[in-house]
Amino acid sequence: MMSAKDMVKVMIVMLAICFLARSDGKSVKKRAVSEIQFMHNLGKHLSSMERVEWLRKKLQDVHNFVALGASIAYRDGSSQRPRKKEDNVLVESHQKSLGEADKADVDVLIKAKPQ
């Protein structure tokens, strides 16, 4: 059987543990939920950053393509691929004139800053 002195020591140790733990009445599950939410937000942020990086690379490719003076493809789906290596030279008389919507797209792409 425990004496009163031993019981007081146990109570003091228990009080010290409870005081130093500082749970403030918050359950551990609440912290686990916030950690899960943090990881979810981090995952969304990382996937968003991947998409932004992919889009930046694609816009850079398009910007480089337009900056080199390459012709814009026809919208009716016809192919403008050169059949021979010599056909890769651009000739102004064969280039398609840009419509209003195409000009706006090209303006935006030209103004994009490469990084």
UniProtKB/Swiss-Prot annotation:
GO terms for cellular component: extracellular space. Residues 51-69 are annotated as: Important for receptor binding. Parathyroid hormone elevates calcium level by dissolving the salts in bone and preventing their renal excretion. Acts by binding to its receptor, PTH1R, activating G protein-coupled receptor signaling. Stimulates [1-14C]-2-deoxy-D-glucose (2DG) transport and glycogen synthesis in osteoblastic cells. It comes from Bos taurus (Bovine). It is found in: Secreted. One of its GO terms (molecular function) is type 1 parathyroid hormone receptor binding. Disulfide bonds: none annotated. SMART domains: PTH. Residues 77-99 are annotated as: Disordered. Residues 84-99 have a biased composition (Basic and acidic residues). Its main location: secreted. Residues 26-31 form a propeptide. Keywords: Cleavage on pair of basic residues, Hormone, Secreted, Signal. Belongs to the parathyroid hormone family. It comes from the Eukaryota. Pfam families: Parathyroid (PF01279). Residues 1-25 form the signal peptide. This is Parathyroid hormone. Interacts with PTH1R (via N-terminal extracellular domain). GO terms for biological process: adenylate cyclase-activating G protein-coupled receptor signaling pathway; bone mineralization; cell-cell signaling; homeostasis of number of cells within a tissue; intracellular calcium ion homeostasis; magnesium ion homeostasis; negative regulation of apoptotic process in bone marrow cell; negative regulation of gene expression.
